[in-house]
UniProtKB/Swiss-Prot annotation:
Record keywords, A-Z: DNA-directed RNA polymerase, Metal-binding, Nucleotidyltransferase, Nucleus, Phosphoprotein, Transcription, Transferase, Zinc, Zinc-finger
Zinc finger extent (C4-type): 1070-1096
Origin species: Dictyostelium discoideum
Enzyme superclass (EC): transferase
Record-given protein name: DNA-directed RNA polymerase I subunit rpa2
Keyword Cell membrane: no
Subcellular location: Nucleus, Nucleolus
Subunit structure: Component of the RNA polymerase I (Pol I) complex consisting of 14 subunits.
Catalytic activity: RNA(n) + a ribonucleoside 5'-triphosphate = RNA(n+1) + diphosphate
Keyword flag Metal-binding: yes
Main location: nucleus
Additional notes on this entry: Three distinct zinc-containing RNA polymerases are found in eukaryotic nuclei: polymerase I for the ribosomal RNA precursor, polymerase II for the mRNA precursor, and polymerase III for 5S and tRNA genes.
The EC number(s) this enzyme carries: 2.7.7.6
Function: DNA-dependent RNA polymerase catalyzes the transcription of DNA into RNA using the four ribonucleoside triphosphates as substrates. Second largest core component of RNA polymerase I which synthesizes ribosomal RNA precursors. Proposed to contribute to the polymerase catalytic activity and forms the polymerase active center together with the largest subunit. Pol I is composed of mobile elements and RPA2 is part of the core element with the central large cleft and probably a clamp element that moves to open and close the cleft.
Length: 1130
């Protein structure tokens, strides 16, 4: 098992394991009860238990293990039973404590408990709850999986679906921003604000915004049921702590009394709150509770103070349960906001990875579950109350009514299946996300590299794709080593869809790592012992002191010089990994004090949460590998290569200069010799290559699978080719290549292939397609489950050549369009019905699968009604098929040239591929020239060549290194050879560049795309040919094509294309009034058809003209809006 390969997909599996092992329990613990009244008694209901099993299927009343491949082959979902329990409680006095202590529901016994079936929850392959977890490669092959199966995806309706990673704002970190939209929040609101995304232990989050108002006041905004609410910050400070105005003033100003900008605003904010005459904490909580009471579902017995506390617990800094911590964080945010407005610090860049983390599959699962549990209870409550309004059922007892309702309620797990199948999120609250669609994609198994790339891709979000600004797409310096600078698509998603670099890790949640949990408790006392002044010791510090925060909790203050020393010590201890207070995955972000305008707000921020980016570098002090985060990287001195190290300045060095690239970008040979866009194109084309997506072809029922028959390992490869086991899934062939302009068939990037090389198998491929045939589809309910495959008329139907005696097609047979495909017995009259093959091209029947019912009860061979047929289509190269080298040099096959006419070298070698030398100068893909050289040397000496980037430089050149190898074998050191014409046998005047290059065959093939039609379907409205290759449509003759014919003056050709071959029509028109709408045909006394103009009352002035039919449609549409159009007919 490849550990490196496993690490690429690990974040997905870790997040799902967090959901199953901890997330479900945390969601249950944090889920809110729902209150309602019945017979003047207050009740509440809440979930008391949630239980997830492992995937099983039911066979004749017996549960047996369900393996992923069964779900793939049968087109079903890989899921497990999900059950829960709901408790009904009577609300008593114990619920009404106002002192802020949380009610422990687990100690309260429910009066009734109801077991509920919540459906079947889709399970991630190879997660802890999957049967493949921990299997050896041999066992995986026995289970019909790949030897290198890594999992990380879900199987829904037979398709492999990936929940794509999304960029989120960094958890629990206050970010200073300018947002123009904030000025619309109300009168006096400015564009200045601080935003913080507070994440609870169960990974659900709430975003709090602190706004700056023109007069110097600040307000905190949060969302509740998609509605915005604002709280004045000074009011909230009093609600969080029983304190005085003097203490609040001192906490914010921190002894900086000469800063009148700050002191004036703080005084004004405090004076404004005096007007309300609310002073104590209890009074403030009562005031907040009374304002919000109408919005909540709480019973009247609940006091305002309790409701006020509930609002603060649920919506204000939810990551901090302690009110004192909430108070200190709000003070810090107010200080940062005033510093930004006063010009002491600048805004933070939300587009930089320093202020970003990632949203993973398991975390979004937890968010959805939390919301669906609430929705489940709300629908239960409304149905129960409705049932008591019904006079027939009003006599039912509450537990009986509740049980009836719970049996009919929706299945929570079905919402997850819908989410994975469509990628759409149906949410009442929006769960603090900026999008509702595009969460899931199908994990294409086009080739191995494309499949792996799905797990490393990270999207900025659907909302940003619609934005016109380009700032969000820019490559930030902070993303070095975390996001790949090369691997992003060209076109619309450029810069929005990035890929993690091959060394980038995503941290696991603290709940999954006991060392992190332990460190979180030990760290405050460790820091206090090393120079930090705890925040609660004194209220006034010098304003120059730095604030130390841990995961959004203010721990204390430190003097700036001591702070710098502390950071060095913490990083050293982190690299050594032997101090229990400092976990290896802790990010130590240090922004030093600066006098520069718009610098970063100074402070030390420590992060131990999950879902953050980290990457390894070598700490020069300890000599050990150390994990660093994007926010701390900004102020670190890291050398890329050893000779860049400056003594006394450089503290770290990169593990490798290629560590900044993604897996795919690292596979491009000699990428440092190429122009950057070509490396980008190669990253895209590697993902479109036909290759070896998997080895378990017989057990796969994917909609479409590609396969190239003669694949090889590349002679020239990078270190990652071995490291990530890419040679187990090769996707190309080492071709002998000549760079020569030979026949004229190689113009414009076209390439000539040696016909004999083609006949030997160069580029030969196949496409596998699977077709599900379900006889119950489209039948009435009466006929379903009564229609079966069969062929009773075997003696007389003359179908022995096509169909077997069971009514199914023969495996291995070549089937052509229109030939009999299968037969079945119609239940209404018991007659045999033959269905023909409707495909457009001939195919081989690779295999036929029989799919039994979900319960597996109908295993009778005579009662088969659902099959899956795998068809194999031949896809050998034809003229127009696309090929490419590994340097973005794409071209189409222009001619299969006979070998006897191919140019040859002195040694008798003939090229497999000829390309034009004009492909190189403008594109500057020197890497390809070096590869041809290295490939030639490798082939001659029989050894693989290392083409990892940045290993050659000006002093030690690649040309010398590989040229030496060629010279030793007796070849020209620059790769040129004397060649002779294949047609005349004469020697070419110049030497030809000749060598070996790895070529890929791309999936864009003429057989899949060619489109031709003479006559066919037309649009009913316009009578023009319809579009679409599948439905037999035509190719559009568009505006540009029209313009070129106009420019050529080819009017007859234009007439033919746009009228005769399109919507030619003969229309009657009145010469007098020029109308085409008022002509009316009738029969005269001799039964002859006569046309007459209704407006002119004349039948003599009617003429017939030829015009496109769509013109009459235009005239009718204009007439509908009271515009008449007249023609002048001579």
């Amino acid at each position: 098992m490849s550990e490196e390969l496993k690490s690429l997909i690990q974040p997905h599996i870790d997040s799902f394991d967090f959901f199953t092992d901890h997330g479900i329990d945390l969601v249950l613990k944090d889920s809110e009860p729902l209150y309602f009244e019945h017979n003047s008694t207050q009740y509440k209901i809440r979930f008391t238990d949630l239980k997830l099993s492992r995937p099983t299927r039911n066979i004749v009343e017996k549960e047996i293990k369900l393996y992923p491949n069964e779900s793939r082959e049968t087109g079903t979902t890989y899921n497990a039973p999900f059950k829960g329990a709901i408790g009904l409680y009577e609300v008593n006095e114990m619920d009404e404590m106002d002192d802020g202590t949380e009610v422990d529901y687990n100690k309260q016994e429910p009066t009734h408990t109801f077991e509920v079936d919540l459906g079947r929850l889709p399970i991630m392959v190879k997660s802890r709850y999957c049967h493949l977890n921990g299997m050896s490669p041999e066992k995986l092959i026995e289970s019909r999986e790949e030897e290198l199966e890594q999992g990380g995806y879900f199987i829904v309706n037979g398709n492999e679906k990936v929940v794509r990673m999304l960029v989120m704002t960094k958890a629990n970190h206050p970010v200073a921003l300018h947002r123009k939209a904030w000025t619309n929040r109300g009168p006096g609101y400015t564009k200045n604000g601080i935003t913080i995304r507070c994440v609870r232990p169960d990974r659900s989050s709430i975003t709090n915004n602190l706004h700056y108002i023109n007069d110097g006041q600040t307000t905190l905004r949060f969302l509740y049921r998609r509605q915005e609410f604002f709280l004045p910050a000074t009011l909230l400070l009093k609600a969080l702590k029983d304190t005085t105005e003097k203490e609040i003033y001192e906490n914010i100003v921190q002894g900086d009394n000469e800063n009148t900008f700050l002191t004036d605003r703080v005084e004004l904010s405090l004076r404004e709150q005096k007007i309300n005459n609310i002073n104590t904490q209890e009074e403030v909580l009562d005031y907040i509770g009374s304002r919000f009471r109408a919005r909540t579902q709480f019973p009247p017995s609940f006091s305002n103070i309790k409701i006020g506390r509930w609002f603060i617990n649920q919506f204000v800094f939810v990551h901090l349960p302690n009110y004192n911590d909430k108070y200190n964080l709000l003070i810090l945010m107010i200080q940062k906001l005033y510093a930004m407005v006063g010009g002491k610090c600048g805004t933070d860049n939300i587009d930089s990875p320093a202020f970003q983390e990632v949203l993973l599959a398991g975390h979004i699962y937890g968010m959805i579950l939390k919301e669906k549990l609430t929705e489940y209870l709300e629908s239960t409550k409304s149905f129960v109350l409705k049932s008591f309004e019904d006079k027939k059922k009003s006599g039912d007892k509450l537990p009986d009514a509740l049980k009836k309702v719970l049996d009919k309620n929706f299945k929570i797990a079905d919402r997850f299946s819908y989410f994975l199948a469509t990628g759409n999120l149906r949410s009442s609250s929006g769960i603090d996300l900026q999008q509702t669609s595009g969460f899931c994609v199908i994990a294409d198994k086009l080739n191995f590299l494309r499949f792996i790339s799905h797990f490393r891709s990270i999207h900025r979000g659907a909302f940003f794709a619609t934005m016109k600004t380009t700032a969000i797409r820019k490559l930030m310096p902070e993303s070095w080593g975390f996001f790949c600078p090369v691997h992003t698509p060209d076109g619309a998603p450029c810069g929005l869809l990035n890929h993690l670099s091959s060394n980038c890790l995503v941290t696991v949640d603290a709940a999954q790592d006991p060392t992190v949990q332990k460190a979180q408790t030990l760290l405050p006392s460790f820091l206090a012992a090393h120079g930090m002044l705890p925040i609660d010791m004194v209220s006034v510090y010098q304003h120059q002191y730095l604030t130390i925060t841990l995961d959004g909790r203010v721990l204390g203050k430190i003097e700036p010089k001591a702070g710098e020393e502390m950071v060095k010590m913490l990083r050293y201890l982190r690299s050594m990994g032997n101090e229990p207070s400092i976990p290896k995955t802790m990010e130590i972000s240090y922004a030093p004090p600066t006098n520069v305008e718009n610098g970063q707000y100074s402070g030390i921020s420590l992060f131990t949460t999950g879902a953050r980016f980290m990457r390894p570098v070598v700490n020069l002090t300890s000599g050990q590998n150390e994990l660093i985060g994007p926010q701390e990287q900004l102020y670190m001195e890291i050398a890329v290569v050893p000779h860049e190290v400056i003594k006394g300045v450089t503290t770290h060095i990169e593990t490798s200069p290629t560590a900044m690239f993604s897996l795919l970008a690292n596979l491009t040979p000699f990428s440092d010799y190429n122009q950057s866009p070509r490396n980008m194109y190669q990253c895209q084309m590697a993902k479109q290559t036909m290759g070896t997506p998997l080895h378990s072809y017989p057990f796969r029922t994917d909609n479409k699978l590609y396969k190239v028959q003669n694949v090889q390992k590349p002679i020239v490869h990078t270190k990652n080719q071995f490291k990530f086991r890419c040679n187990d899934y090769p996707h190309g062939c080492n071709a002998v290549i000549a760079v020569i302009s030979n026949t004229g068939y190689d113009m414009e990037d076209a390439m000539i292939i040696n016909k004999s090389a083609y006949e030997r198998g160069f580029g030969h491929g196949s496409v596998y397609k699977n077709e599900y045939i379900d006889l119950d589809q489209g039948l009435s309910r009466f006929e379903q489950k009564k229609t079966f495959f069969g062929r009773p008329n075997t003696v007389v139907d003359e179908l022995d050549k096509f169909i077997d005696t069971d009514g199914l097609p023969f495996v291995g047979r070549l089937i052509k369009p229109g030939e009999p495909y299968y037969t079945y017995i119609r239940p209404s009259d018991g007659r045999q019905v033959t269905k023909d093959y409707k495909g457009k091209e001939e195919a081989y029947i690779e295999d036929v699968r029989i799919i039994f019912g979900p319960n597996g009860a109908t295993r009778d061979p005579s009662k088969i009604n659902n099959i899956c047929v795998k068809l194999r289509f031949n896809r050998n190269p034809v003229i127009g098929d696309k090929f490419s080298s590994r340097h973005g040099q794409k071209g189409v096959l222009s001619q299969l040239w006979p070998e006897i006419n191919m140019p040859f070298t002195e040694s008798g070698m003939k090229p497999d591929v000829i390309i034009n030398p004009n492909a190189f100068p403008s594109r500057m893909t020197i890497g390809m020239l070096v590869e041809i050289l290295a490939g030639k040397a490798g082939a001659i000496h029989g050894k693989f060549q290392d083409a990892t980037a940045f290993q050659f430089d000006e002093n030690n050149t690649a040309i010398d290194f590989f040229g030496e190898q060629l010279a030793k074998a007796g070849f020209n050191r620059f790769g040129n050879e004397q060649m002779y014409s294949g047609t005349t046998g004469k020697e070419f005047e110049c030497e030809i560049f000749f060598g070996v290059c790895y070529y890929q065959r791309l999936r864009h093939m003429v057989k899949d795309k060619y489109q031709v039609r003479a006559l066919g379907k037309v649009n009913a409205l316009t009578r023009q040919p319809i579009k679409g290759r599948k439905v037999g449509g035509g190719i559009r003759f568009g505006e540009m094509e029209r313009d070129s014919l106009l420019a050529h003056g080819a009017s007859f050709c234009l007439n033919d294309r746009l009228m005769k071959s399109s919507d030619f029509a003969k229309i009657k028109v009145c010469k007098l009034c020029g109308s085409t709408l008022t002509i009316y045909s009738k029969k005269d006394y001799s039964n002859q058809t006569v046309s007459e103009c209704k407006s002119c009352k004349s039948s003599d002035s009617i003429a017939t003209i030829s015009i496109p039919y769509v013109f009459t449609y235009l005239v009718a549409e204009l007439a509908a809006v009271n515009i008449t159009m007249k023609l002048q007919v001579s």
